[in-house]
Protein backbone atom coordinates (compact mmCIF):
# COMPACT_ATOMS: atom_id res chain seq x y z
CA UNK A 1 0.00 0.00 0.00
CA UNK A 2 1.29 3.46 -0.89
CA UNK A 3 2.14 5.80 1.98
CA UNK A 4 -0.85 8.05 2.76
CA UNK A 5 -3.35 5.92 0.85
CA UNK A 6 -6.54 5.04 2.70
CA UNK A 7 -7.31 1.36 3.32
CA UNK A 8 -9.69 -0.22 0.83
CA UNK A 9 -12.41 -0.63 3.47
CA UNK A 10 -12.27 3.05 4.36
CA UNK A 11 -12.54 4.04 0.69
CA UNK A 12 -15.60 1.82 0.29
CA UNK A 13 -17.28 3.41 3.30
CA UNK A 14 -16.48 6.89 1.98
CA UNK A 15 -17.95 6.04 -1.44
CA UNK A 16 -21.08 4.67 0.22
CA UNK A 17 -21.45 7.83 2.32
CA UNK A 18 -21.12 10.00 -0.80
CA UNK A 19 -23.79 7.97 -2.61
CA UNK A 20 -26.16 8.30 0.35
CA UNK A 21 -25.52 12.05 0.48
CA UNK A 22 -26.23 12.42 -3.24
CA UNK A 23 -29.48 10.49 -2.82
CA UNK A 24 -30.50 12.80 0.03
CA UNK A 25 -29.73 15.85 -2.09
CA UNK A 26 -31.79 14.44 -4.96
CA UNK A 27 -34.71 13.79 -2.61
CA UNK A 28 -34.39 17.22 -1.04
CA UNK A 29 -34.42 18.84 -4.45
CA UNK A 30 -37.60 17.00 -5.36
CA UNK A 31 -39.56 18.27 -2.35
CA UNK A 32 -38.06 21.71 -2.13
CA UNK A 33 -36.08 21.39 1.10
CA UNK A 34 -32.78 22.04 -0.68
CA UNK A 35 -33.93 25.66 -0.94
CA UNK A 36 -35.01 25.87 2.68
CA UNK A 37 -38.61 25.16 1.73
CA UNK A 38 -40.78 22.80 3.80
CA UNK A 39 -41.21 19.15 2.71
CA UNK A 40 -43.84 18.43 0.05
CA UNK A 41 -46.32 17.01 2.57
CA UNK A 42 -46.64 20.42 4.23
CA UNK A 43 -47.12 22.27 0.95
CA UNK A 44 -50.24 22.96 -1.10
CA UNK A 45 -48.88 22.49 -4.61
CA UNK A 46 -52.02 24.05 -6.08
CA UNK A 47 -51.32 27.45 -4.52
CA UNK A 48 -48.63 29.43 -6.30
CA UNK A 49 -47.93 31.46 -9.40
CA UNK A 50 -46.53 31.17 -12.92
CA UNK A 51 -42.85 32.02 -13.39
CA UNK A 52 -40.93 32.50 -16.60
CA UNK A 53 -38.61 29.57 -17.35
CA UNK A 54 -36.56 29.63 -20.54
CA UNK A 55 -36.08 25.83 -20.35
CA UNK A 56 -39.77 25.36 -21.16
CA UNK A 57 -41.74 23.89 -22.89
CA UNK A 58 -41.16 20.32 -21.76
CA UNK A 59 -41.48 19.09 -25.37
CA UNK A 60 -41.83 20.50 -28.87
CA UNK A 61 -45.33 19.99 -30.25
CA UNK A 62 -43.98 19.25 -33.73
CA UNK A 63 -42.24 16.16 -32.30
CA UNK A 64 -45.45 14.74 -30.87
CA UNK A 65 -47.51 13.01 -33.57
CA UNK A 66 -50.51 12.40 -31.29
CA UNK A 67 -51.75 15.97 -30.79
CA UNK A 68 -55.20 16.56 -32.23
CA UNK A 69 -55.56 19.51 -34.55
CA UNK A 70 -57.72 21.49 -32.11
CA UNK A 71 -54.88 21.60 -29.54
CA UNK A 72 -51.93 22.08 -31.91
CA UNK A 73 -51.81 25.88 -31.82
CA UNK A 74 -48.33 26.26 -33.34
CA UNK A 75 -49.24 24.07 -36.29
CA UNK A 76 -52.43 26.10 -36.71
CA UNK A 77 -50.42 29.30 -37.08
CA UNK A 78 -50.21 30.81 -33.60
CA UNK A 79 -47.36 33.33 -34.05
CA UNK A 80 -46.32 34.03 -30.43
CA UNK A 81 -44.40 31.58 -28.23
CA UNK A 82 -43.94 33.28 -24.84
CA UNK A 83 -46.98 31.42 -23.50
CA UNK A 84 -44.90 28.23 -23.71
CA UNK A 85 -42.25 29.54 -21.32
CA UNK A 86 -44.10 29.54 -18.01
CA UNK A 87 -43.68 27.01 -15.20
CA UNK A 88 -46.03 26.52 -12.26
CA UNK A 89 -44.27 27.35 -8.99
CA UNK A 90 -46.03 26.43 -5.71
CA UNK A 91 -45.68 29.06 -2.99
CA UNK A 92 -44.15 26.79 -0.36
CA UNK A 93 -42.15 24.08 -2.13
CA UNK A 94 -40.73 22.95 -5.46
CA UNK A 95 -42.24 20.37 -7.78
CA UNK A 96 -40.14 17.50 -9.07
CA UNK A 97 -39.51 18.11 -12.77
CA UNK A 98 -41.54 15.71 -14.84
CA UNK A 99 -39.49 12.55 -15.42
CA UNK A 100 -41.14 10.38 -18.05
CA UNK A 101 -38.79 7.44 -17.59
CA UNK A 102 -39.46 7.41 -13.83
CA UNK A 103 -43.18 7.66 -14.54
CA UNK A 104 -43.07 4.65 -16.87
CA UNK A 105 -40.32 2.61 -15.23
CA UNK A 106 -41.24 2.98 -11.57
CA UNK A 107 -44.58 4.66 -10.88
CA UNK A 108 -46.68 3.12 -13.67
CA UNK A 109 -44.72 -0.01 -14.57
CA UNK A 110 -47.19 -2.85 -15.03
CA UNK A 111 -50.12 -0.50 -14.39
CA UNK A 112 -52.96 1.29 -16.14
CA UNK A 113 -53.88 4.96 -15.78
CA UNK A 114 -57.27 6.09 -17.05
CA UNK A 115 -58.56 9.61 -17.63
CA UNK A 116 -62.37 9.67 -17.54
CA UNK A 117 -64.23 12.78 -18.67
CA UNK A 118 -64.82 15.23 -21.49
CA UNK A 119 -62.49 16.90 -23.99
CA UNK A 120 -60.54 18.55 -21.15
CA UNK A 121 -59.58 15.03 -20.08
CA UNK A 122 -58.63 14.38 -23.71
CA UNK A 123 -56.48 17.52 -23.50
CA UNK A 124 -54.67 16.15 -20.44
CA UNK A 125 -54.39 12.62 -21.85
CA UNK A 126 -52.77 13.89 -25.04
CA UNK A 127 -50.40 16.05 -22.99
CA UNK A 128 -49.27 13.01 -21.01
CA UNK A 129 -48.75 10.89 -24.13
CA UNK A 130 -46.56 13.68 -25.55
CA UNK A 131 -44.56 13.98 -22.33
CA UNK A 132 -43.94 10.22 -22.26
CA UNK A 133 -43.14 10.01 -25.98
CA UNK A 134 -40.62 12.82 -25.47
CA UNK A 135 -39.01 10.93 -22.58
CA UNK A 136 -38.81 7.63 -24.45
CA UNK A 137 -38.93 8.48 -28.19
CA UNK A 138 -37.42 5.15 -29.24
CA UNK A 139 -39.64 3.01 -27.02
CA UNK A 140 -42.16 0.89 -28.87
CA UNK A 141 -45.66 2.26 -28.32
CA UNK A 142 -49.13 1.60 -29.68
CA UNK A 143 -52.20 3.81 -29.87
CA UNK A 144 -55.73 2.50 -30.37
CA UNK A 145 -59.19 4.06 -30.25
CA UNK A 146 -62.34 1.95 -30.03
CA UNK A 147 -65.87 2.87 -31.21
CA UNK A 148 -66.95 2.82 -27.55
CA UNK A 149 -64.85 5.90 -26.88
CA UNK A 150 -61.85 4.28 -25.16
CA UNK A 151 -58.43 5.45 -26.34
CA UNK A 152 -55.37 3.50 -25.22
CA UNK A 153 -51.71 4.51 -25.48
CA UNK A 154 -49.47 1.59 -24.45
CA UNK A 155 -45.78 1.02 -23.78
CA UNK A 156 -45.30 -2.78 -24.02
CA UNK A 157 -41.74 -2.62 -22.65
CA UNK A 158 -43.11 -1.20 -19.41
CA UNK A 159 -46.42 -3.10 -19.53
CA UNK A 160 -48.02 0.30 -18.99
CA UNK A 161 -51.11 1.88 -20.54
CA UNK A 162 -52.40 5.45 -20.47
CA UNK A 163 -56.10 5.48 -21.33
CA UNK A 164 -58.84 8.00 -22.00
CA UNK A 165 -62.53 7.14 -21.67
CA UNK A 166 -64.84 9.82 -23.05
CA UNK A 167 -67.63 10.29 -20.53
CA UNK A 168 -68.63 13.92 -20.14
CA UNK A 169 -71.21 13.50 -17.36
CA UNK A 170 -70.01 10.33 -15.54
CA UNK A 171 -73.68 9.44 -14.91
CA UNK A 172 -75.90 7.68 -17.46
CA UNK A 173 -77.79 9.08 -20.43
CA UNK A 174 -80.28 6.54 -21.81
CA UNK A 175 -82.64 6.47 -24.76
CA UNK A 176 -82.63 8.13 -28.17
CA UNK A 177 -83.76 11.58 -29.35
CA UNK A 178 -86.19 13.05 -28.53
CA UNK A 179 -86.44 10.96 -25.36
CA UNK A 180 -82.88 10.96 -24.05
CA UNK A 181 -82.87 10.98 -20.26
CA UNK A 182 -79.95 11.87 -18.02
CA UNK A 183 -80.21 9.71 -14.88
CA UNK A 184 -78.48 11.57 -12.06
CA UNK A 185 -78.61 8.51 -9.79
CA UNK A 186 -77.19 5.92 -12.20
CA UNK A 187 -73.71 4.85 -13.33
CA UNK A 188 -73.49 1.81 -15.63
CA UNK A 189 -70.05 2.40 -17.19
CA UNK A 190 -68.13 1.81 -13.99
CA UNK A 191 -67.00 -1.72 -14.87
CA UNK A 192 -64.43 -0.16 -17.21
CA UNK A 193 -63.13 2.08 -14.43
CA UNK A 194 -62.41 -0.94 -12.25
CA UNK A 195 -59.68 -2.07 -14.67
CA UNK A 196 -57.40 0.90 -13.89
CA UNK A 197 -54.76 1.33 -11.18
CA UNK A 198 -54.98 5.12 -11.31
CA UNK A 199 -58.18 7.00 -12.17
CA UNK A 200 -58.37 10.71 -13.02
CA UNK A 201 -61.95 11.98 -13.39
CA UNK A 202 -63.26 15.23 -14.81
CA UNK A 203 -66.72 16.63 -15.54
CA UNK A 204 -68.21 20.10 -15.89
CA UNK A 205 -68.14 21.89 -19.24
CA UNK A 206 -70.89 19.83 -20.90
CA UNK A 207 -73.27 20.60 -18.03
CA UNK A 208 -73.55 24.13 -19.41
CA UNK A 209 -74.61 23.14 -22.94
CA UNK A 210 -78.12 24.03 -24.07
CA UNK A 211 -80.39 23.63 -27.09
CA UNK A 212 -78.84 21.55 -29.90
CA UNK A 213 -75.54 21.09 -28.06
CA UNK A 214 -77.34 19.52 -25.11
CA UNK A 215 -77.07 15.71 -25.42
CA UNK A 216 -80.20 14.93 -23.37
CA UNK A 217 -83.91 15.85 -23.44
CA UNK A 218 -84.87 15.36 -19.79
CA UNK A 219 -83.30 14.84 -16.36
CA UNK A 220 -84.28 12.13 -13.88
CA UNK A 221 -83.46 12.51 -10.19
CA UNK A 222 -84.83 9.69 -8.08
CA UNK A 223 -88.33 8.98 -9.39
CA UNK A 224 -88.85 12.50 -10.68
CA UNK A 225 -88.26 13.45 -14.32
CA UNK A 226 -88.08 17.11 -15.36
CA UNK A 227 -87.38 18.95 -18.58
CA UNK A 228 -84.52 20.87 -16.98
CA UNK A 229 -83.17 22.06 -13.64
CA UNK A 230 -80.50 24.35 -12.26
CA UNK A 231 -77.35 22.93 -13.83
CA UNK A 232 -75.21 23.38 -10.72
CA UNK A 233 -77.81 21.49 -8.66
CA UNK A 234 -77.90 18.70 -11.25
CA UNK A 235 -74.10 18.62 -11.29
CA UNK A 236 -73.91 18.22 -7.52
CA UNK A 237 -76.44 15.37 -7.58
CA UNK A 238 -74.41 13.58 -10.26
CA UNK A 239 -71.14 14.12 -8.39
CA UNK A 240 -72.71 12.64 -5.25
CA UNK A 241 -73.67 9.57 -7.30
CA UNK A 242 -70.09 9.34 -8.57
CA UNK A 243 -68.69 9.68 -5.03
CA UNK A 244 -70.96 6.91 -3.71
CA UNK A 245 -69.97 4.67 -6.63
CA UNK A 246 -66.27 5.17 -5.86
CA UNK A 247 -66.80 4.41 -2.16
CA UNK A 248 -68.72 1.22 -2.94
CA UNK A 249 -66.63 -0.14 -5.80
CA UNK A 250 -63.00 1.02 -5.54
CA UNK A 251 -60.46 -0.40 -3.10
CA UNK A 252 -58.19 2.53 -2.13
CA UNK A 253 -55.36 0.14 -1.27
CA UNK A 254 -55.27 -0.98 -4.92
CA UNK A 255 -56.49 2.01 -6.92
CA UNK A 256 -55.64 5.70 -6.60
CA UNK A 257 -58.49 8.06 -7.46
CA UNK A 258 -58.13 11.71 -8.45
CA UNK A 259 -60.65 14.31 -9.54
CA UNK A 260 -59.24 16.94 -11.83
CA UNK A 261 -60.48 20.30 -10.60
CA UNK A 262 -62.57 22.55 -12.81
CA UNK A 263 -60.73 23.84 -15.86
CA UNK A 264 -61.99 27.40 -16.47
CA UNK A 265 -62.78 29.09 -19.74
CA UNK A 266 -61.71 32.65 -20.55
CA UNK A 267 -64.57 33.90 -22.67
CA UNK A 268 -65.31 36.98 -20.53
CA UNK A 269 -62.41 39.37 -19.89
CA UNK A 270 -64.32 41.07 -17.07
CA UNK A 271 -63.57 38.00 -14.95
CA UNK A 272 -59.87 38.89 -14.80
CA UNK A 273 -59.79 42.60 -15.65
CA UNK A 274 -61.87 45.53 -14.42
CA UNK A 275 -61.40 47.01 -17.89
CA UNK A 276 -62.27 43.72 -19.58
CA UNK A 277 -65.51 44.78 -21.22
CA UNK A 278 -66.58 42.26 -23.85
CA UNK A 279 -63.11 40.84 -24.45
CA UNK A 280 -62.12 37.17 -24.38
CA UNK A 281 -58.95 35.09 -24.67
CA UNK A 282 -58.35 36.39 -28.21
CA UNK A 283 -54.99 38.13 -28.43
CA UNK A 284 -53.90 37.19 -24.90
CA UNK A 285 -50.19 36.32 -24.82
CA UNK A 286 -49.20 36.46 -21.13
CA UNK A 287 -50.53 34.89 -17.94
CA UNK A 288 -51.93 36.80 -14.98
CA UNK A 289 -49.07 37.38 -12.58
CA UNK A 290 -49.55 36.67 -8.89
CA UNK A 291 -51.82 34.21 -7.11
CA UNK A 292 -55.31 35.71 -7.28
CA UNK A 293 -58.10 35.89 -9.84
CA UNK A 294 -60.58 38.77 -9.97
CA UNK A 295 -63.69 36.59 -10.37
CA UNK A 296 -62.73 34.44 -7.37
CA UNK A 297 -63.41 30.72 -6.86
CA UNK A 298 -65.40 28.79 -9.46
CA UNK A 299 -68.87 27.63 -8.32
CA UNK A 300 -68.39 24.10 -9.68
CA UNK A 301 -64.98 23.91 -7.98
CA UNK A 302 -66.69 24.45 -4.62
CA UNK A 303 -69.25 21.73 -5.42
CA UNK A 304 -66.51 19.21 -6.18
CA UNK A 305 -64.63 20.03 -2.96
CA UNK A 306 -67.86 19.68 -0.97
CA UNK A 307 -68.70 16.31 -2.53
CA UNK A 308 -65.23 14.85 -2.01
CA UNK A 309 -65.40 15.69 1.70
CA UNK A 310 -68.43 13.38 2.00
CA UNK A 311 -66.52 10.36 0.69
CA UNK A 312 -65.51 7.52 2.97
CA UNK A 313 -62.34 7.03 0.94
CA UNK A 314 -61.73 10.54 -0.30
CA UNK A 315 -60.52 11.00 -3.83
CA UNK A 316 -57.60 13.36 -4.18
CA UNK A 317 -58.72 16.69 -5.62
CA UNK A 318 -56.28 17.99 -8.20
CA UNK A 319 -57.32 21.57 -7.63
CA UNK A 320 -56.04 23.05 -10.89
CA UNK A 321 -58.71 25.76 -11.09
CA UNK A 322 -56.76 28.77 -9.80
CA UNK A 323 -53.56 27.93 -11.68
CA UNK A 324 -55.61 27.56 -14.86
CA UNK A 325 -57.62 30.73 -14.23
CA UNK A 326 -54.32 32.62 -14.32
CA UNK A 327 -53.58 31.33 -17.86
CA UNK A 328 -55.86 33.42 -20.08
CA UNK A 329 -53.05 33.16 -22.66
CA UNK A 330 -53.00 29.37 -22.88
CA UNK A 331 -56.06 28.66 -25.05
CA UNK A 332 -56.15 27.91 -28.78
CA UNK A 333 -58.27 31.04 -29.29
CA UNK A 334 -58.47 31.48 -33.09
CA UNK A 335 -55.66 28.94 -33.62
CA UNK A 336 -57.70 25.86 -32.80
CA UNK A 337 -60.11 23.66 -34.73
CA UNK A 338 -61.99 25.70 -37.30
CA UNK A 339 -59.43 28.49 -37.32
CA UNK A 340 -60.61 32.09 -37.22
CA UNK A 341 -64.30 31.21 -37.49
CA UNK A 342 -64.62 30.52 -33.77
CA UNK A 343 -62.40 31.33 -30.77
CA UNK A 344 -61.74 28.41 -28.42
CA UNK A 345 -61.26 29.82 -24.92
CA UNK A 346 -61.99 26.50 -23.15
CA UNK A 347 -59.41 23.98 -24.33
CA UNK A 348 -55.64 24.41 -24.04
CA UNK A 349 -52.76 24.56 -26.47
CA UNK A 350 -50.24 21.70 -26.46
CA UNK A 351 -47.54 22.19 -25.41
CA UNK A 352 -49.09 24.20 -22.61
CA UNK A 353 -51.06 24.29 -19.38
CA UNK A 354 -52.09 20.57 -19.31
CA UNK A 355 -48.38 19.69 -19.16
CA UNK A 356 -48.32 21.40 -15.76
CA UNK A 357 -51.43 19.50 -14.70
CA UNK A 358 -49.53 16.32 -15.48
CA UNK A 359 -46.49 17.56 -13.60
CA UNK A 360 -48.79 17.95 -10.58
CA UNK A 361 -50.18 14.44 -11.17
CA UNK A 362 -46.60 13.16 -11.34
CA UNK A 363 -45.86 14.93 -8.04
CA UNK A 364 -48.94 13.37 -6.42
CA UNK A 365 -47.90 9.88 -7.56
CA UNK A 366 -44.20 10.54 -6.83
CA UNK A 367 -44.97 11.23 -3.17
CA UNK A 368 -47.72 8.64 -2.69
UniProtKB/Swiss-Prot annotation:
The keyword Transmembrane applies. The keyword Transmembrane helix applies. A motif (GDS motif) lies at residues 117-119. GO terms for molecular function: O-acetyltransferase activity. It is found in: Membrane. Keywords: Membrane, Signal-anchor, Transmembrane, Transmembrane helix. InterPro entries: TBL, TBL_C, TBL_N. The chain crosses the membrane at residues 9-25. A motif (DCXHWCLPGXXDXWN motif) lies at residues 344-358. It comes from the Eukaryota. Contains 2 motifs that are conserved in esterases, but it is unlikely that this protein belongs to the catalytically active pectin esterases. May act as a bridging protein that binds pectin and other cell wall polysaccharides. Probably involved in maintaining esterification of pectins. May be involved in the specific O-acetylation of cell wall polymers. Belongs to the PC-esterase family. TBL subfamily. PANTHER family: PROTEIN TRICHOME BIREFRINGENCE-LIKE 43, PROTEIN TRICHOME BIREFRINGENCE-LIKE 9-RELATED. This is Protein trichome birefringence-like 43.
Amino acid sequence: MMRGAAPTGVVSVMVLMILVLLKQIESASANGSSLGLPPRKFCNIYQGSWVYDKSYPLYDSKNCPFIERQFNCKSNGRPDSEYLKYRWQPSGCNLPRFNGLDFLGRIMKGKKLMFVGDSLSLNQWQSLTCLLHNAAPKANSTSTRSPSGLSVFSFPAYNSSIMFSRNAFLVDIVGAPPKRVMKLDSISSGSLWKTADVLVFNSWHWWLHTDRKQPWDAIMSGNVTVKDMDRLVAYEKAMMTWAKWIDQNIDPSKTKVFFQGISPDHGRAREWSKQGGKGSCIGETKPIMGSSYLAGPHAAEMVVAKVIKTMKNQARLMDVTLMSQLRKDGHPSVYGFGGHRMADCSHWCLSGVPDSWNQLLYSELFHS
